[in-house]
Regions:
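Phosphate/pyrophosphate-binding loops at sites that engage ATP/ADP/AMP, CoA/4′-phosphopantetheine
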Residues: 199-214, 268, 377-381, 413-434, ...
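Conserved small-residue
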Residues: 195, 220, 292, 321, ...
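Conserved catalytic cysteine-centered active-site region
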Residues: 41-48, 104, 142-189, 227-291, ...
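Acyl-CoA/ACP chain-elongation machinery
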Residues: 300-358, 391-405, 437-446, 463-516
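Beta-strand segments within the central parallel beta-sheet cores of soluble alpha/beta enzyme folds
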Residues: 208-220, 274-280, 304-309, 383-392, ...
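Active-site-proximal alpha-helical scaffold in enzymes
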Residues: 190-204, 257, 261, 275-310, ...
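A glycine- and small-residue-enriched flexible loop/hinge segment at structural boundaries
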Residues: 4-17, 30-208, 222-237, 256-274, ...
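Condensing-enzyme catalytic core mediating Claisen C-C bond formation in acyl metabolism
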Residues: 2-15, 22, 332-426, 433-434, ...
């Protein structure tokens, strides 16, 4: 029998805040929360954004005021909320009104017959002196240059970006300050924070977990879709020479797209188990999730950390997407709202999935999911937040433009619906399942994805499957977007509210709606109304994926058929302690008392420390050895 992959921990950070304990989800449905939970969300964000620091039972502001929680919220509540979700890009990343560029120019003398001359530090002279230059030493440090003809130059300039909105991490949050970041690119700083959050919020002791399984039965599958493109990664490597700077030894290696997985193995978990990076544009998270799911179901691995960390809010990436016509520009947003005398649009409504829209809004996020097989979760008493029995991924086939949509998403959605129907029945699929759409907010996406979803839904007999899209709040975090969709969906079963696409006032006329119910408002369905969710992704290049997510109550219902009443009762007894530890972590995080896991140089192993025999490999620090009694899958060929 196949093992059931269950979610036992999740965490990270996006523009809505910390993911664990549904804090980011709660920010999205903030207005529907009771007062005590609103206060918890605001205090957590106050700590994250560094508006206040918890000390001696009070909240200390940057001005030195010591406030109680109620006063802090009354004073800063609106400001805290304004620092989240999609909004105008804050200068802490870069100044959208003054982005540096260089213009190519040819300088020539004002009067005919004259020559250009200037002085420069001798050490700044080019290695290869142009043929039309005459160089004369002025002193030990400076030289005079006389140019015969024109001087080819790059003149520094600035410009204002036409795209000014993004799903930026909460303003004031700086992951580099939380550990010894050593010039790590932003995406890797976010990785350390996000992966730590997922592990610690589970309430599980990681040393206990890893000593329950063999070292090679733990896996990390993670990536981002673009690489670390900021100045501390590939971005610095590509432009440093043109900016008159030096390439460092870290630019290239830390820029690789697989680095989130590498960092988790090397500095967070210390894992020597299976590792892999699948990259597929917007579907990257689901591609890595699929690998984990299939490996757990087959028994190859028992524990998997799936993750992604994308930090694509850079001028270069924004300009790249803009020239494709993919991003929502300010002028287009103003035109959509018929605002002629307004300088800037409402940036908080930049992303409008399935409505009249004009492009997606870029976002940044780091999301991490801790999965186990059902047997291990039951043995440990791990909290089960849901189960993922299947992920489907298919390509588009032949096409003209590589970025154009194709048929692959019809296959992934239809396969996922068929699989889910086999588990929860036709009524469960059509009446008790919601769809977490890709929902980018481009005119093309609203037509093509709605047709995919409508065609599949009606084919299975659905008449009103709820459809929502979290990019309306978070923006498009590229390869990590699937993690945003997954983790915010889990909140529906904690609070019973399906978030609506509130930035979209009405569904566009060209959107296919048969069999679907586009959720434009938050709606309370109840915690157990939905048995499952379908998480969809349509990526550039033909990278399509759809994940099947089972509700926690449905996962437990299924497991009760595999385990005895006594085993389930024992599980709940163990789980009480796990939940208590997780709750203590959440409370400590709100107070800012917990730092990310970052174990640089911790328990580093060398080959001489391994005990290798013909049957097994023993590693220091691991109770269970790696088994070398490997099964031959091709005995019939021997």
């Amino acid at each position: 029998l196949a093992r059931l992959p269950v979610i036992v921990g999740f965490g990270g950070i996006n523009s809505a805040g910390r993911t664990s304990f549904h804090q980011a989800y709660r920010r999205i449905i903030f207005d529907l929360l009771p007062n005590d939970l609103q206060q918890e969300v605001l205090l957590d964000l106050a700590n994250i954004t560094q508006i206040a620091e918890f000390q001696n039972g009070l909240w200390l502001t940057a001005d030195g005021e010591a406030l109680d929680a109620e006063t802090l919220i009354d004073t800063f509540g609106e400001e805290i909320l304004a620092r989240t979700l999609i909004r105008r890009i804050h200068p802490s990343l870069f100044d959208v009104d003054n982005v540096v560029l260089h213009k190519s120019s040819a300088l020539s003398p004002v009067s005919e017959g004259e020559k250009l001359s200037f002085s420069v530090k001798t050490r700044s002279l080019p290695d290869n002196i142009p043929a039309n230059w005459q160089v004369k030493a002025l002193s030990n440090t400076h030289s005079e240059i006389t140019v015969d003809g024109t001087l080819e130059t790059f003149i520094k300039d600035t410009k204002s970006l036409s795209v000014k909105a993004a799903g930026q991490l909460p303003t004031g949050f700086d992951p580099a300050k939380l550990y010894q970041s050593r010039n790590h690119p932003r995406g890797l700083q976010m990785t350390v924070y996000g992966a730590s959050d997922a592990i610690l919020s589970s309430g599980l002791d990681w040393d206990v977990v890893r000593n329950q399984v063999a070292p090679d039965q733990i896996a990390v599958y993670a990536a981002n879709s673009i690489g670390q493109m900021d100045d501390l990664g590939f971005g610095g490597m590509l432009k440093s020479a043109l900016m008159g700077k030096r390439t460092t030894s870290k630019h290239l290696p830390l820029g690789y797209a697989q680095m989130p997985a590498d960092f988790v193995n090397a500095y967070v978990l210390g894992s020597v188990g299976n590792v892999g990076t699948s990259i597929g544009a917007c579907a990257t998270y689901f591609f890595n999730l699929e690998r984990a799911i299939e490996s757990i179901k087959s028994g190859k691995i028992r524990v998997a950390m799936v993750g992604g960390s994308d930090a694509p809010i850079t001028p270069e990436i924004i300009e790249g997407f803009r020239t494709m016509g993919a991003l929502a520009e300010d002028t287009a947003l103003l035109a959509l709202d018929l605002l002629e005398n307004q300088k800037e649009p409402d940036h908080t409504r930049s992303c409008r999935p399935f409505a009249q829209n004009c492009g997606f809004t870029i976002g940044e996020s780091s999301q991490w999911t801790l999965l186990m097989d059902d047997e291990l979760a039951i043995d440990l008493g791990a909290t089960i937040y849901g189960a993922i029995p299947a992920v489907y991924a298919f390509a588009d086939g032949y096409k003209k433009s590589i970025s154009a949509p194709g048929v692959g998403n019809y296959l992934t959605v239809s396969k996922a619906m068929a699989y889910l129907q086999n588990i929860i029945g036709k009524e469960g699929l059509t009446k008790h399942t919601f769809i977490q759409a890709h929902g980018t907010s481009t005119p093309q996406n609203r037509v093509t994805e709605s047709h995919v979803l409508s065609k599949a839904a009606t084919s299975f007999g659905a008449d009103a499957m709820p459809v929502t899209a979290m990019k309306a709040y978070l923006g498009h975090s590229q390869g990590t977007a699937g993690g945003d969709q997954l983790h915010l969906s889990l909140g529906v079963w904690e609070h019973g509210v399906l978030p609506g696409i509130v930035t979209s006032s009405e569904v566009a006329d060209d959107v296919y709606q048969a069999g679907l119910k586009f959720q434009l408002k938050h709606e309370e369905y109840g915690k157990t109304h939905f048995d499952a969710a379908l998480l969809n992704s349509k990526g550039f290049g033909g990278n399509n994926a759809t994940a099947v997510l089972l509700a926690p109550h449905k996962a437990i219902e299924l497991l009760k058929k595999r385990y005895s009443e006594e085993q389930i009762e024992e599980y709940y007894e163990k789980n009480a302690a796990i939940k208590s530890a997780a709750t203590a972590y959440n409370e400590a995080m709100i107070r800012g008392e917990i730092k990310p896991i970052y174990r640089f140089g911790f328990n580093v192993l060398g080959g001489e420390e391994l005990d290798i025999s013909e049957q097994q490999i023993k590693l220091p620090g691991y109770e269970i050895p790696v088994d070398l009694n490997v099964t031959n899958d091709f005995e019939d060929l021997i």
